[in-house]
């Protein structure tokens, strides 16, 4: 067998690009550097859902209650003094080495009964006002239960006592 050779030039299909690596690392612009700040560990405690937000207004609470009712869940108010509101060694019966925030054998006192017949947010606001008037130095949270699954679905703080020193405004939460 004989092979014929020709003088053809071979052109590559694609040229390779040189990779240029930056000489330094950056997180972007200087305005994004706030995301890299240090969390303030003192007097900066949170309760469940929405705790990272400023205190909820009555309108915001009403919208949350409307969402709860649209899902056929039952709202309920609970309250606790500042000595019982957070998990500590003194107020928690531990079954093991650790404690979470809900299943820790530390229960808040229920305000009246769950609001089975509740039809709008104004009824819950009336009960929050009554509970705040009766216990002005207590933390008050709104929880909701799903009767079908028999579990607590959500819980969030609706009243923080005036004397509370454990809350920081969002702008003051980082160093």
Curated annotation (Swiss-Prot):
GO cellular component, one term: chloroplast
Similarity-based family: Belongs to the RuBisCO small chain family.
PANTHER family to which the protein is assigned, alphabetical: RIBULOSE BISPHOSPHATE CARBOXYLASE SMALL CHAIN 1, CHLOROPLASTIC, RIBULOSE BISPHOSPHATE CARBOXYLASE SMALL SUBUNIT, CHLOROPLASTIC 1
Additional record remark: The basic functional RuBisCO is composed of a large chain homodimer in a 'head-to-tail' conformation. In form I RuBisCO this homodimer is arranged in a barrel-like tetramer with the small subunits forming a tetrameric 'cap' on each end of the 'barrel'.
Family matches, as SUPFAM superfamilies: RuBisCO, small subunit
Main localisation: plastid
Assembly, per entry: Heterohexadecamer of 8 large and 8 small subunits.
Keywords: Calvin cycle, Carbon dioxide fixation, Chloroplast, Photorespiration, Photosynthesis, Plastid, Transit peptide
Gene3D superfamilies: Ribulose bisphosphate carboxylase, small subunit
Function: RuBisCO catalyzes two reactions: the carboxylation of D-ribulose 1,5-bisphosphate, the primary event in carbon dioxide fixation, as well as the oxidative fragmentation of the pentose substrate. Both reactions occur simultaneously and in competition at the same active site. Although the small subunit is not catalytic it is essential for maximal activity.
GO molecular function: ribulose-bisphosphate carboxylase activity
Keyword Cytoplasm: no
One of the Pfam families matching this protein, by short name: RuBisCO_small
Phylogenetic classification of the source organism: Eukaryota, Viridiplantae, Chlorophyta, Ulvophyceae, TCBD clade
Protein's GO biological process: photorespiration; reductive pentose-phosphate cycle
Protein name in the entry: Ribulose bisphosphate carboxylase small subunit, chloroplastic
Transit peptide range per the UniProt entry: 1-34
Localisation per UniProt entry: Plastid, Chloroplast
């Amino acid at each position: 067998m004989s092979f014929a050779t020709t003088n053809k030039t071979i052109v590559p299909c694609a040229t390779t690009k040189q990779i240029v690596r930056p000489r330094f690392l950056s997180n972007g612009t200087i305005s994004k550097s706030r995301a890299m700040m240090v969390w303030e560990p003192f007097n900066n405690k949170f309760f469940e859902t929405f705790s990272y937000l400023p205190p909820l207004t009555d309108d915001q609470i009403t919208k949350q209650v409307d969402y709860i009712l649209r899902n056929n869940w039952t709202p309920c108010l609970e309250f606790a003094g500042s000595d019982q509101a957070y998990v500590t060694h003194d107020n928690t019966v531990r079954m093991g080495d650790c404690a979470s925030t809900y299943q820790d054998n530390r229960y808040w006192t229920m305000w009246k009964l769950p609001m089975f017949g509740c039809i709008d947010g104004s009824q819950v606001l009336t009960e929050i006002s009554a509970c705040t008037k009766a216990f002005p130095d207590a933390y008050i949270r709104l929880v909701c239960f799903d009767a079908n699954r028999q579990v607590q679905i959500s819980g969030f703080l609706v009243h923080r006592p005036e004397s509370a020193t454990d809350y920081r405004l969002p702008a003051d939460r980082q160093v």
